[in-house]
Amino acid sequence: MLNPIVRKFQYGQHTFTLETGMMARQATAAVMASMDDTAVFVTVVGAKQAKTGQSFFPLTVNYQERTYAAGRFPGGFFRREGRPSEGETLISRLIDRPIRPLFPEGFLNEVHVIATVVSVNPQVSPDIVAMIGASAALSLSGIPFSGPIGAARVGYINDQYVLNPTQAELATSRLDLVVAGTQNAVLMVESEAQLLSEDQMLGAVVYGHDQQQIVIDNINQLVAEAGKPKWQWQAQDVNAGLQARVAELAESRLGDSYRITEKQERYAAVDAIKADVVEALTGQDETLDVGEIKDILGALEKSVVRSRVLRGEPRIDGREKDMIRGLDVRTGVLPRTHGSALFTRGETQALVTATLGTERDAQNIDELTGERTDRFLLHYNFPPYCVGETGMVGSPKRREIGHGRLAKRGVLAVMPNASEFPYTVRVVSEITESNGSSSMASVCGASLALMDAGVPIKAAVAGIAMGLVKEGDNFVVLSDILGDEDHLGDMDFKVAGSREGVTALQMDIKIEGITHEIMQVALNQAKGARMHILGVMERAISSPRGNISEFAPRIHTIKISSDKIKDVIGKGGSVIRALTEETGTTIEIEDDGTVKVAATDGDKARHAIRRIEEITAEIEVGRIYNGKVTRIVDFGAFFAIGGGKEGLVHISQIADKRVEKVADYLELGQEVPVKVLEVDRQGRVRLSIKEASAPSQDAVVPEAE
């Protein structure tokens, strides 16, 4: 018999339910998590044995959305879900980041978490539900895991924090922040903000962490009722004798190598030390495990670097804790791009471009809740050469998608709206060198490239990555961390913003015990660093250029009556297609009659606008037009009278005398003055040649085209 065990509780304005014991009973653990009508089914499977030779923790998180959850069919020829979307990839990372640090060091068994969205309320995002479901499933599984964690979304509306705001509320919120953590500590923050202060951002983190305690309490109660026995796993004992021998051979040499400031030279020195130690020890005793020696060397390397920082000694590259690496800022570095910048900070460098396009260049995104259009794209590329390595080059990996999204969050708050700047904008960041915080270099480069392209952003933005080394109550916050400091430290804390406030905050913490004080110190130190970087950037370009690039399309906007839209488009799009070919422009028409004409040549744009005005001009009864014969039929002839409009001259209106054969009087392409006699209810135009030739007629004769 199926005996579901259920926990139900109020979470902000929503009802949250956790249910286990009904489905996927062959998985290590499974939970159906739901918030209102949004439900995510989460499974966890853990391998009982680690793979032989495994040297890292193989945790895989897959978040997947099923279109049936929204009562829809998938798009595409096969009508089936395919590769993960960018949104699914980002939420997979969102689940992974707070749970990964909670597995014990040395645990190398494969763990696979799958979160499947099976029902969706358009007002309730599935990401928070999936994070809580993954936490509950891992806690139930018995796998070594120092959870559970809670997760919460925090908005900021009318100067008040809002727990788990709906999609409608987020539209008016100045903040979209996701925070996850255990009972005692924050582990992960992901956010974008509308230029909030550091205190407001920190307040949101603390508020979200406080509110999610009810989630942790309910997961603990569910585990007490339905949890599986804890795995009998023990970390491998450290060989103290081997540890001492490795320290004797390597400690002082590693300390010296970490005084080498150039990255590749330092890496070569460290690799040589490790190779020497392995060779020396295995030469004395062939039974020693090379993997164990390397693990001890890695731990020793970490200890050497951290101890130096905590003692207040200079950092790896000789800087003090709050110093920023040397900056080099250049704009307009590529001649034919619409905007470009080269931003260099120490050994991290980003070549960033901005490209302007029309509305049809915008990205149409098909989501569970329906389609939406994105007018601002930011893509981040991290080729292997930027770290001096060889490797595969192809479609973007999870890391590139995640870093691109973070950089986009950092810039989004200062982008102009469509009414101010009717362009689609694509920013691409090519990381050409990397030694820490390439995503924040992308934020700086994006701001510079956008200003170089003439995009009227509200303010310049810059980003900085902070780090932390903490032992007991002793801690040091580091500004502008290197890649090694990120790897060997306890926190990666990225902040982007303008002089006015914060636009994005991302935090990943590897240890418990990060206090309110530490986060406050990090935010304040980051603000000082951001102001320094903005000062250097402003010396290169202080405001957006007054004009867009000569190679970018100029968008001209006119308004026509909405009942004239069909005339400009024509049957099957024939008129607008002919217009774009004739004028060499791009023409877009909105439902309210707004017409956008885009062209790199101003004369072409003006020509297109003039043609549209002719097409949409009202035909005046009694007015004489210069018509051109387009068709000859037995009962008369059809004339083009300008603006794509056509009228009929009946055979009786060709001449003052009786006409037996139209072709005796008219031929195709002939231009003749015609007078408008009538426009009927269906828009059909009656014309006359004989009335136009009467001596009393006015000589108002526009050219037909």
Curated annotation (Swiss-Prot):
GO terms for molecular function: 3'-5'-RNA exonuclease activity; magnesium ion binding; polyribonucleotide nucleotidyltransferase activity; RNA binding. It is found in: Cytoplasm. SMART domains: KH (SM00322), S1 (SM00316). It is an enzyme of class 2 (transferase). SUPFAM superfamilies: Eukaryotic type KH-domain (KH-domain type I), Nucleic acid-binding proteins, Ribonuclease PH domain 2-like, Ribosomal protein S5 domain 2-like. The keyword Zinc-finger does not apply. Pfam families: KH_1, PNPase, RNase_PH, RNase_PH_C, S1. It catalyses: RNA(n+1) + phosphate = RNA(n) + a ribonucleoside 5'-diphosphate. Residues 553-612 form the KH domain. Transmembrane segments: none annotated. Its EC number is 2.7.7.8. Coiled coil: none annotated. Residues 622-690 form the S1 motif domain. Mg(2+) binds at D486, D492. Disulfide bonds: none annotated. GO terms for biological process: mRNA catabolic process; RNA processing. Belongs to the polyribonucleotide nucleotidyltransferase family. Component of the RNA degradosome, which is a multiprotein complex involved in RNA processing and mRNA degradation. HAMAP family: PNPase. Involved in mRNA degradation. Catalyzes the phosphorolysis of single-stranded polyribonucleotides processively in the 3'- to 5'-direction. This is Polyribonucleotide nucleotidyltransferase. It comes from Sodalis glossinidius (strain morsitans).
